[in-house]
């Protein structure tokens, strides 16, 4: 029996624990290192415009920064957890701009083709200026590999699951 039981039969639960420990441990150790300096101009302007004490704005900015670090870690965690599936391969930073692909020999049942996946934690994590690049990468991988590509949004913009062309 696994040392850590989460009720997920499709992945090795010990590896899930190790992934969580690694991703979030790395995030926490980075946060405990030397923090980036805040933008004093933005902080002063925000305090004046919102009529808030400067210290309250400084504290809020620190909390916002911590939240951003956590959000980024959660996005990476989702990618790595999905990569634990024996049917998927995590591509990491060498993935040609995408996060996952189906494991060798695995085909998507609906298409009978391999798949490539770009994983985003939330629907709004792609800047509008980057959407075309993501689209072009997914299209290129699909066309050049006889595959299907997906943009996976763990938290979509609406509260219903969907599978539709982008």
Where are these regions (language model features)?
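Short, conserved, surface-exposed binding loops centered on an aromatic residue
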Residues: 92, 107-109, 140-144
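Conserved catalytic cores of phosphodiester-cleaving nucleases, focusing on short active-site segments
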Residues: 98-126
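Interdomain/boundary linker segments immediately adjacent to catalytic/signaling cores
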Residues: 1-77
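Short N-terminal edge-element motif at the start of the domain
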Residues: 69-95
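Catalytic cores of nucleic-acid endonucleases
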Residues: 121-166
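Generic detector of solvent-exposed, compositionally biased contiguous segments
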Residues: 22-38, 115-134
């Amino acid at each position: 029996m696994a040392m850590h039981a989460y009720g997920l039969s499709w992945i090795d639960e010990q590896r899930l624990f190790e992934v969580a420990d690694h991703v979030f441990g790395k995030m926490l150790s980075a946060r405990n290192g030397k923090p980036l300096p805040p933008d004093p101009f933005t902080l002063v302007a925000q305090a004046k415009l919102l009529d808030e004490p400067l210290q309250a704005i400084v504290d809020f900015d620190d909390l916002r920064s911590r939240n951003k670090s956590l959000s980024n870690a959660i996005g990476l965690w989702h990618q790595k957890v999905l990569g634990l599936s024996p049917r998927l391969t995590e591509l990491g930073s060498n993935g040609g701009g995408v996060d996952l692909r189906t494991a060798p020999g695995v085909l998507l049942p609906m298409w009978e083709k391999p798949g490539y996946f770009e994983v985003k934690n939330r629907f709004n994590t792609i800047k509008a200026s980057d959407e075309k690049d993501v689209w072009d990468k997914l299209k290129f991988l699909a066309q050049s590999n006889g595959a299907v590509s997906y943009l996976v949004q763990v938290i979509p913009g609406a509260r219903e699951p969907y599978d539709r062309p982008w």
